[in-house]
Amino acid sequence: MNIETIITRAWQRKAAWLWLLLPVSWLYALLMVLRRQAYKVGILASYRAPIPVMVIGNITVGGSGKTPLIIALVRHLQQQGIKVGVISRGYGGDSSQMPALVTTESPPNVVGDEPCLIVNTTGTAMAVSPNRQQAIAILLEAYPDLQLIIADDGLQHYALQRDIEWVVVDAARGFGNKQLLPTGFLREPISRLKDANVIYHHKPDASSIYNKSDHNTLLTEHLTMHLQPDDLELLWSSNNQIDNLAVVAMAPEKGSQVHAVSGIGYPQRFFDTLNALGFEVIPHPYPDHYDFSLDELLQYADHPIIVTSKDAVKIRALIMQAIINQALSDEYKELVSRLWVLPVTAVLSDSCYESLQQQLQTLDIDISMRKQ
Protein backbone atom coordinates (compact mmCIF):
# COMPACT_ATOMS: atom_id res chain seq x y z
CA MET A 1 0.00 0.00 0.00
CA ASN A 2 1.52 3.35 -1.06
CA ILE A 3 1.46 6.59 0.91
CA GLU A 4 -1.27 8.08 -1.31
CA THR A 5 -3.62 5.19 -0.51
CA ILE A 6 -2.85 5.39 3.22
CA ILE A 7 -3.60 9.11 3.39
CA THR A 8 -6.71 8.80 1.20
CA ARG A 9 -8.16 6.16 3.50
CA ALA A 10 -7.24 8.31 6.51
CA TRP A 11 -9.20 11.21 5.00
CA GLN A 12 -12.19 8.94 4.52
CA ARG A 13 -11.99 7.78 8.16
CA LYS A 14 -11.19 11.29 9.42
CA ALA A 15 -8.24 9.78 11.25
CA ALA A 16 -7.02 11.87 14.20
CA TRP A 17 -3.34 11.35 13.33
CA LEU A 18 -3.76 13.52 10.22
CA TRP A 19 -3.61 16.60 12.45
CA LEU A 20 0.03 15.76 13.14
CA LEU A 21 0.64 16.78 9.52
CA LEU A 22 -0.76 20.28 10.05
CA PRO A 23 2.68 22.00 9.97
CA VAL A 24 3.23 20.43 6.54
CA SER A 25 -0.13 21.82 5.42
CA TRP A 26 0.89 25.30 6.61
CA LEU A 27 4.10 25.06 4.61
CA TYR A 28 2.13 23.84 1.58
CA ALA A 29 -0.28 26.80 1.95
CA LEU A 30 2.60 29.26 2.08
CA LEU A 31 4.20 27.78 -1.03
CA MET A 32 0.86 27.86 -2.88
CA VAL A 33 0.31 31.55 -2.05
CA LEU A 34 3.86 32.50 -3.04
CA ARG A 35 3.65 30.52 -6.27
CA ARG A 36 0.34 32.05 -7.34
CA GLN A 37 1.51 35.56 -6.52
CA ALA A 38 4.72 34.97 -8.47
CA TYR A 39 2.65 34.23 -11.57
CA LYS A 40 0.36 37.21 -10.93
CA VAL A 41 3.17 39.75 -10.74
CA GLY A 42 5.23 38.16 -13.51
CA ILE A 43 8.13 36.74 -11.50
CA LEU A 44 7.21 33.38 -13.00
CA ALA A 45 6.37 33.42 -16.70
CA SER A 46 2.89 32.48 -17.87
CA TYR A 47 1.51 31.79 -21.33
CA ARG A 48 -1.54 33.32 -23.01
CA ALA A 49 -3.01 31.25 -25.83
CA PRO A 50 -4.00 32.98 -29.08
CA ILE A 51 -7.65 31.99 -28.48
CA PRO A 52 -9.77 32.00 -25.29
CA VAL A 53 -9.13 29.31 -22.67
CA MET A 54 -11.71 27.90 -20.26
CA VAL A 55 -10.28 25.96 -17.33
CA ILE A 56 -12.31 23.20 -15.64
CA GLY A 57 -10.90 21.97 -12.35
CA ASN A 58 -11.40 21.50 -8.64
CA ILE A 59 -9.77 22.46 -5.36
CA THR A 60 -9.99 18.96 -3.86
CA VAL A 61 -8.14 15.71 -4.42
CA GLY A 62 -10.30 12.98 -5.89
CA GLY A 63 -13.15 12.86 -8.36
CA SER A 64 -15.74 15.61 -8.48
CA GLY A 65 -17.52 14.92 -11.77
CA LYS A 66 -15.18 17.08 -13.83
CA THR A 67 -14.85 14.76 -16.83
CA PRO A 68 -18.62 14.28 -17.37
CA LEU A 69 -18.99 18.07 -17.10
CA ILE A 70 -16.36 18.61 -19.80
CA ILE A 71 -18.11 16.10 -22.05
CA ALA A 72 -21.45 17.87 -21.52
CA LEU A 73 -19.94 21.28 -22.27
CA VAL A 74 -18.15 20.06 -25.39
CA ARG A 75 -21.35 18.49 -26.72
CA HIS A 76 -23.32 21.66 -25.99
CA LEU A 77 -20.77 23.89 -27.69
CA GLN A 78 -20.55 21.57 -30.70
CA GLN A 79 -24.32 21.66 -31.11
CA GLN A 80 -24.22 25.45 -31.01
CA GLY A 81 -21.69 25.47 -33.83
CA ILE A 82 -18.72 26.49 -31.67
CA LYS A 83 -15.39 24.97 -32.70
CA VAL A 84 -14.00 23.75 -29.39
CA GLY A 85 -10.89 21.78 -28.50
CA VAL A 86 -9.65 20.26 -25.24
CA ILE A 87 -6.22 19.98 -23.67
CA SER A 88 -5.11 17.83 -20.75
CA ARG A 89 -1.89 16.87 -19.02
CA GLY A 90 -2.67 13.25 -19.96
CA TYR A 91 -2.36 11.78 -16.47
CA GLY A 92 -1.70 8.04 -16.63
CA GLY A 93 -0.22 8.31 -20.11
CA ASP A 94 3.38 8.26 -21.32
CA SER A 95 4.78 11.79 -21.07
CA SER A 96 7.78 10.80 -23.20
CA GLN A 97 5.39 10.54 -26.17
CA MET A 98 3.81 13.95 -25.54
CA PRO A 99 2.72 16.41 -26.76
CA ALA A 100 0.32 14.28 -28.73
CA LEU A 101 -3.03 14.61 -30.43
CA VAL A 102 -5.74 12.32 -29.10
CA THR A 103 -7.84 10.32 -31.55
CA THR A 104 -10.30 7.46 -31.23
CA GLU A 105 -7.36 5.15 -31.96
CA SER A 106 -5.11 6.52 -29.21
CA PRO A 107 -4.14 3.97 -26.53
CA PRO A 108 -4.92 5.07 -22.95
CA ASN A 109 -1.46 4.04 -21.75
CA VAL A 110 -0.02 6.70 -24.08
CA VAL A 111 -2.45 9.64 -23.77
CA GLY A 112 -4.33 8.80 -20.55
CA ASP A 113 -7.73 7.29 -19.84
CA GLU A 114 -9.75 10.52 -19.41
CA PRO A 115 -8.59 12.02 -22.75
CA CYS A 116 -9.56 8.76 -24.48
CA LEU A 117 -12.99 8.88 -22.86
CA ILE A 118 -13.54 12.53 -23.84
CA VAL A 119 -12.55 11.98 -27.48
CA ASN A 120 -14.37 8.66 -27.86
CA THR A 121 -17.53 10.26 -26.50
CA THR A 122 -17.47 13.63 -28.27
CA GLY A 123 -15.06 13.34 -31.21
CA THR A 124 -13.58 16.69 -30.19
CA ALA A 125 -10.13 17.93 -31.13
CA MET A 126 -7.80 17.21 -28.22
CA ALA A 127 -4.12 17.25 -27.29
CA VAL A 128 -2.22 16.15 -24.19
CA SER A 129 1.00 17.22 -22.54
CA PRO A 130 2.18 18.11 -19.03
CA ASN A 131 3.31 21.33 -20.75
CA ARG A 132 -0.03 22.99 -21.57
CA GLN A 133 1.64 25.47 -23.95
CA GLN A 134 2.97 22.58 -26.04
CA ALA A 135 -0.46 20.93 -25.99
CA ILE A 136 -2.09 24.13 -27.27
CA ALA A 137 0.55 24.56 -29.97
CA ILE A 138 0.08 21.08 -31.42
CA LEU A 139 -3.71 21.39 -31.12
CA LEU A 140 -3.89 24.70 -33.00
CA GLU A 141 -1.43 23.47 -35.62
CA ALA A 142 -3.80 20.60 -36.41
CA TYR A 143 -7.03 22.59 -35.89
CA PRO A 144 -6.29 26.27 -36.66
CA ASP A 145 -9.98 27.27 -36.80
CA LEU A 146 -10.74 26.49 -33.14
CA GLN A 147 -12.59 29.24 -31.26
CA LEU A 148 -12.23 27.99 -27.68
CA ILE A 149 -9.97 25.65 -25.72
CA ILE A 150 -11.17 23.82 -22.61
CA ALA A 151 -8.31 22.94 -20.26
CA ASP A 152 -9.05 19.76 -18.32
CA ASP A 153 -7.90 19.94 -14.70
CA GLY A 154 -5.71 23.00 -15.16
CA LEU A 155 -6.94 25.10 -12.25
CA GLN A 156 -3.63 25.01 -10.36
CA HIS A 157 -1.55 25.27 -13.55
CA TYR A 158 -0.95 29.01 -13.30
CA ALA A 159 1.62 28.94 -16.08
CA LEU A 160 -1.43 28.91 -18.37
CA GLN A 161 -3.44 32.13 -18.41
CA ARG A 162 -7.17 31.63 -18.61
CA ASP A 163 -10.27 33.63 -19.54
CA ILE A 164 -12.85 31.51 -17.70
CA GLU A 165 -12.55 29.29 -14.62
CA TRP A 166 -15.16 26.73 -13.59
CA VAL A 167 -14.57 24.78 -10.38
CA VAL A 168 -16.53 21.60 -9.66
CA VAL A 169 -17.46 21.00 -6.01
CA ASP A 170 -18.91 17.70 -4.81
CA ALA A 171 -21.69 19.04 -2.57
CA ALA A 172 -22.17 15.71 -0.78
CA ARG A 173 -18.49 15.18 -0.07
CA GLY A 174 -17.82 18.80 0.77
CA PHE A 175 -14.36 19.81 1.93
CA GLY A 176 -13.77 17.29 4.72
CA ASN A 177 -11.85 18.89 7.59
CA LYS A 178 -11.28 21.98 5.38
CA GLN A 179 -7.51 21.62 5.64
CA LEU A 180 -4.97 21.74 2.84
CA LEU A 181 -2.86 18.76 1.82
CA PRO A 182 -1.79 16.53 3.47
CA THR A 183 -3.92 17.10 6.61
CA GLY A 184 -7.00 17.42 4.43
CA PHE A 185 -7.80 16.89 0.77
CA LEU A 186 -7.87 20.54 -0.34
CA ARG A 187 -5.44 21.55 -3.08
CA GLU A 188 -6.21 25.22 -2.44
CA PRO A 189 -8.08 27.14 0.27
CA ILE A 190 -11.88 27.35 0.09
CA SER A 191 -11.49 31.10 -0.44
CA ARG A 192 -10.15 30.26 -3.93
CA LEU A 193 -13.77 29.71 -4.99
CA LYS A 194 -14.39 33.46 -4.88
CA ASP A 195 -12.37 33.85 -8.08
CA ALA A 196 -14.26 31.32 -10.21
CA ASN A 197 -17.63 30.00 -11.28
CA VAL A 198 -18.48 27.17 -8.89
CA ILE A 199 -20.51 24.23 -10.16
CA TYR A 200 -22.07 22.32 -7.27
CA HIS A 201 -22.31 18.64 -8.13
CA HIS A 202 -25.16 17.17 -6.11
CA LYS A 203 -27.35 14.09 -6.13
CA PRO A 204 -30.46 14.37 -8.35
CA ASP A 205 -32.76 13.99 -5.33
CA ALA A 206 -30.71 16.13 -2.93
CA SER A 207 -32.89 18.34 -0.77
CA SER A 208 -30.04 20.81 -0.43
CA ILE A 209 -27.48 21.44 -3.13
CA TYR A 210 -24.67 22.43 -0.82
CA ASN A 211 -23.48 22.41 2.74
CA LYS A 212 -24.23 25.92 3.96
CA SER A 213 -21.56 25.80 6.63
CA ASP A 214 -19.02 25.38 3.86
CA HIS A 215 -20.31 27.66 1.16
CA ASN A 216 -22.92 30.19 2.25
CA THR A 217 -20.51 33.10 2.49
CA LEU A 218 -18.88 32.49 -0.86
CA LEU A 219 -21.48 32.85 -3.59
CA THR A 220 -24.67 34.65 -4.44
CA GLU A 221 -25.38 32.57 -7.54
CA HIS A 222 -25.32 28.78 -7.45
CA LEU A 223 -24.66 26.75 -10.58
CA THR A 224 -25.52 23.08 -10.24
CA MET A 225 -25.17 19.76 -12.00
CA HIS A 226 -25.88 16.13 -11.29
CA LEU A 227 -24.82 12.86 -12.88
CA GLN A 228 -27.62 10.90 -14.49
CA PRO A 229 -26.87 7.16 -14.85
CA ASP A 230 -27.65 5.74 -18.26
CA ASP A 231 -28.52 2.14 -19.14
CA LEU A 232 -25.91 -0.53 -18.54
CA GLU A 233 -23.88 -1.40 -21.63
CA LEU A 234 -21.75 -4.40 -22.44
CA LEU A 235 -18.14 -3.32 -22.17
CA TRP A 236 -17.23 -5.23 -25.33
CA SER A 237 -19.98 -5.23 -27.92
CA SER A 238 -20.21 -7.32 -31.07
CA ASN A 239 -19.88 -4.08 -33.04
CA ASN A 240 -16.14 -4.29 -32.52
CA GLN A 241 -16.00 -6.97 -35.24
CA ILE A 242 -12.60 -8.10 -34.06
CA ASP A 243 -11.61 -11.74 -34.38
CA ASN A 244 -15.31 -12.73 -34.48
CA LEU A 245 -15.60 -12.09 -30.75
CA ALA A 246 -19.32 -11.47 -30.42
CA VAL A 247 -20.50 -11.13 -26.84
CA VAL A 248 -24.15 -11.69 -26.04
CA ALA A 249 -25.29 -11.46 -22.43
CA MET A 250 -28.27 -10.39 -20.37
CA ALA A 251 -27.79 -7.29 -18.26
CA PRO A 252 -27.82 -7.95 -14.50
CA GLU A 253 -31.23 -7.42 -12.93
CA LYS A 254 -32.08 -5.22 -9.98
CA GLY A 255 -31.53 -7.06 -6.73
CA SER A 256 -28.76 -9.22 -8.15
CA GLN A 257 -25.23 -9.28 -6.79
CA VAL A 258 -22.66 -7.39 -8.85
CA HIS A 259 -18.99 -6.60 -8.45
CA ALA A 260 -18.44 -2.84 -8.69
CA VAL A 261 -14.83 -2.32 -9.75
CA SER A 262 -13.64 1.25 -9.83
CA GLY A 263 -10.34 3.07 -10.28
CA ILE A 264 -11.61 6.65 -10.10
CA GLY A 265 -10.95 9.55 -7.76
CA TYR A 266 -14.02 9.09 -5.56
CA PRO A 267 -15.33 5.54 -6.08
CA GLN A 268 -17.95 5.74 -3.32
CA ARG A 269 -20.16 7.84 -5.58
CA PHE A 270 -20.11 5.04 -8.17
CA PHE A 271 -20.98 2.43 -5.54
CA ASP A 272 -23.80 4.60 -4.17
CA THR A 273 -25.24 5.02 -7.66
CA LEU A 274 -25.33 1.27 -8.23
CA ASN A 275 -26.96 0.76 -4.83
CA ALA A 276 -29.58 3.36 -5.72
CA LEU A 277 -30.27 1.48 -8.96
CA GLY A 278 -31.18 -1.57 -6.89
CA PHE A 279 -28.11 -3.77 -7.21
CA GLU A 280 -26.54 -5.68 -4.33
CA VAL A 281 -23.10 -4.15 -4.66
CA ILE A 282 -19.81 -5.81 -3.76
CA PRO A 283 -17.45 -2.80 -3.89
CA HIS A 284 -13.85 -3.01 -5.06
CA PRO A 285 -12.20 0.44 -4.88
CA TYR A 286 -8.84 0.92 -6.57
CA PRO A 287 -6.57 3.99 -6.78
CA ASP A 288 -7.43 6.63 -9.37
CA HIS A 289 -6.21 5.79 -12.91
CA TYR A 290 -5.40 2.24 -11.78
CA ASP A 291 -4.00 -0.09 -14.45
CA PHE A 292 -6.08 -3.25 -14.30
CA SER A 293 -5.11 -6.59 -15.75
CA LEU A 294 -7.45 -9.25 -17.13
CA ASP A 295 -6.02 -11.74 -14.66
CA GLU A 296 -6.91 -9.40 -11.82
CA LEU A 297 -10.48 -9.04 -13.06
CA LEU A 298 -10.88 -12.82 -13.31
CA GLN A 299 -11.23 -13.03 -9.53
CA TYR A 300 -14.58 -11.23 -9.82
CA ALA A 301 -16.01 -13.35 -12.62
CA ASP A 302 -18.45 -15.21 -10.34
CA HIS A 303 -20.90 -12.29 -10.72
CA PRO A 304 -21.44 -9.57 -13.31
CA ILE A 305 -18.75 -6.88 -13.12
CA ILE A 306 -19.74 -3.24 -13.53
CA VAL A 307 -17.13 -0.55 -14.16
CA THR A 308 -17.12 3.17 -14.91
CA SER A 309 -16.72 4.59 -18.41
CA LYS A 310 -13.21 5.76 -17.51
CA ASP A 311 -12.11 2.30 -16.40
CA ALA A 312 -13.80 0.74 -19.44
CA VAL A 313 -11.44 2.63 -21.75
CA LYS A 314 -8.42 0.82 -20.33
CA ILE A 315 -10.11 -2.56 -20.04
CA ARG A 316 -11.17 -2.46 -23.70
CA ALA A 317 -7.54 -1.78 -24.60
CA LEU A 318 -6.52 -4.87 -22.61
CA ILE A 319 -9.04 -7.02 -24.45
CA MET A 320 -7.93 -5.64 -27.81
CA GLN A 321 -4.29 -6.38 -27.00
CA ALA A 322 -5.16 -9.93 -25.94
CA ILE A 323 -6.97 -10.46 -29.24
CA ILE A 324 -4.06 -9.06 -31.25
CA ASN A 325 -1.66 -11.32 -29.35
CA GLN A 326 -4.03 -14.28 -29.81
CA ALA A 327 -4.05 -14.61 -26.04
CA LEU A 328 -7.79 -14.37 -25.42
CA SER A 329 -8.41 -17.73 -23.74
CA ASP A 330 -11.84 -19.22 -23.11
CA GLU A 331 -11.52 -18.03 -19.52
CA TYR A 332 -10.96 -14.47 -20.72
CA LYS A 333 -13.87 -14.74 -23.15
CA GLU A 334 -16.13 -15.74 -20.27
CA LEU A 335 -14.83 -12.75 -18.32
CA VAL A 336 -15.58 -10.41 -21.24
CA SER A 337 -19.19 -11.60 -21.27
CA ARG A 338 -19.55 -10.49 -17.63
CA LEU A 339 -18.12 -6.99 -18.04
CA TRP A 340 -20.59 -4.10 -18.01
CA VAL A 341 -20.25 -0.32 -18.07
CA LEU A 342 -22.45 2.23 -16.33
CA PRO A 343 -22.23 5.45 -18.38
CA VAL A 344 -23.30 8.70 -16.74
CA THR A 345 -24.37 12.01 -18.23
CA ALA A 346 -23.81 15.37 -16.57
CA VAL A 347 -27.10 17.27 -16.39
CA LEU A 348 -26.47 20.99 -15.97
CA SER A 349 -28.86 23.57 -14.55
CA ASP A 350 -30.18 26.36 -16.79
CA SER A 351 -28.01 28.81 -14.86
CA CYS A 352 -24.89 26.96 -16.06
CA TYR A 353 -25.80 27.51 -19.70
CA GLU A 354 -26.80 31.11 -19.04
CA SER A 355 -23.50 31.81 -17.30
CA LEU A 356 -21.58 30.12 -20.12
CA GLN A 357 -23.37 32.26 -22.70
CA GLN A 358 -22.58 35.47 -20.84
CA GLN A 359 -18.93 34.58 -20.37
CA LEU A 360 -18.43 33.58 -24.00
CA GLN A 361 -20.16 36.71 -25.26
CA THR A 362 -17.57 38.82 -23.42
CA LEU A 363 -14.99 36.90 -25.47
CA ASP A 364 -16.87 37.60 -28.74
CA ILE A 365 -18.02 33.98 -29.02
CA ASP A 366 -21.74 33.91 -29.79
CA ILE A 367 -23.73 31.06 -28.30
CA SER A 368 -27.49 30.61 -28.06
CA MET A 369 -29.43 30.02 -24.84
CA ARG A 370 -30.60 26.57 -25.93
CA LYS A 371 -29.68 23.96 -23.32
CA GLN A 372 -29.13 20.26 -23.96
Swiss-Prot record:
SUPFAM superfamilies to which the protein is assigned, alphabetical: P-loop containing nucleoside triphosphate hydrolases
InterPro entries: LpxK, P-loop_NTPase
Keyword RNA-binding in annotation: no
Catalytic reaction(s) noted: a lipid A disaccharide + ATP = a lipid IVA + ADP + H(+)
Record's signal peptide: none
Record-level GO BP terms: lipid A biosynthetic process; lipopolysaccharide core region biosynthetic process
Binding-site residues for ATP, renumbered to this chain: 60-67
EC number: 2.7.1.130
Keywords linked to the UniProt accession: ATP-binding, Kinase, Lipid A biosynthesis, Lipid biosynthesis, Lipid metabolism, Nucleotide-binding, Transferase
Any Pfam family: LpxK
Listed pathway(s): Glycolipid biosynthesis; lipid IV(A) biosynthesis; lipid IV(A) from (3R)-3-hydroxytetradecanoyl-[acyl-carrier-protein] and UDP-N-acetyl-alpha-D-glucosamine: step 6/6
Keyword Nucleotide-binding: yes
Function: Transfers the gamma-phosphate of ATP to the 4'-position of a tetraacyldisaccharide 1-phosphate intermediate (termed DS-1-P) to form tetraacyldisaccharide 1,4'-bis-phosphate (lipid IVA).
Protein family according to the UniProt entry: Belongs to the LpxK family.
Name this polypeptide is given: Tetraacyldisaccharide 4'-kinase
Species of provenance: Psychrobacter cryohalolentis (strain ATCC BAA-1226 / DSM 17306 / VKM B-2378 / K5)
